Amino acid sequence: MANQLILLKKDFFTDEQQAVTVADRYPQDVFAEHTHEFCELVMVWRGNGLHVLNDRPYRITRGDLFYIRAEDKHSYTSVNDLVLQNIIYCPERLKLNVNWQAMIPGFQGAQWHPHWRLGSMGMNQARQVINQLEHESNGRDPLANEMAELLFGQLVMTLKRHRYATDDLPATSRETLLDKLITALANSLECPFALDAFCQQEQCSERVLRQQFRAQTGMTINQYLRQVRICHAQYLLQHSPLMISEISMQCGFEDSNYFSVVFTRETGMTPSQWRHLSNQSD
């Protein structure tokens, strides 16, 4: 694309030997669609926003993890106190003898699955390593780049150990109620979600859980679920031949008219308009 914004290495790395650095987004503002001369890992710490990656929308919040390749195009919109960190790296500059392809989805042709989640335990461990990595990447001593790369290796191994598919928190997990709730919501795209039943199963207070969720994500539980469903609907409208009424059902709306009302309110256009516009841009 002729007018595509490209983020350049020279604007983020101190020299041509530096392989890894950290870019803080405290908070992440609206950011136009762009690609990069480098790759990045994106860790979301709190708040929420709309992350559009290669034309697929994701409603992101605390614990979301993305593996972004240089050629991927993405943007951030509808942000609300969104706090994240970008760990950016140049694959060709990495010197450490590590099987990076096994650790990083999409690394130099490896199988790519961009979106994962981290629970509280994984987030805490990753944050500690990222803090050290940020310190070293800003260092000026002769071993700073080597130390930063060692820490990057530790980070990608930590992420591989703790990451899980967005709708598949391991049954043996010791993660928090909030992590379990977000996974349960991801499993409720097509069917109603009963918070009271979830709280009864987990033996927790519904009121306290609602407060915790809003404090960490900046949204109510219902708002989050609705927006996740709308993101899924946007994807299906663009990439599937399903009728709008069928997409409505697959996104948890039994009434297609109500689905159209909610979709229009959230996106500013009807499902038909969205599909038409998306097909034109393909």
From Swiss-Prot:
Record site feature (Interaction with sigma-70), residues: 246
InterPro entries: AraC-bd, Homeodomain-like_sf, HTH_AraC, HTH_AraC-typ_CS, RhaR_RhaS-like_N, RmlC-like_jellyroll, RmlC_Cupin_sf, Tscrpt_act_RhaR
Pfam families: AraC_binding, HTH_18
GO terms, molecular function: DNA-binding transcription factor activity; sequence-specific DNA binding
Binding region for DNA: 196-217, 244-267
Residue ranges of domain HTH araC/xylS-type in the record: 179-277
Protein name stated in the entry: HTH-type transcriptional activator RhaR
Source species: Salmonella arizonae (strain ATCC BAA-731 / CDC346-86 / RSK2980)
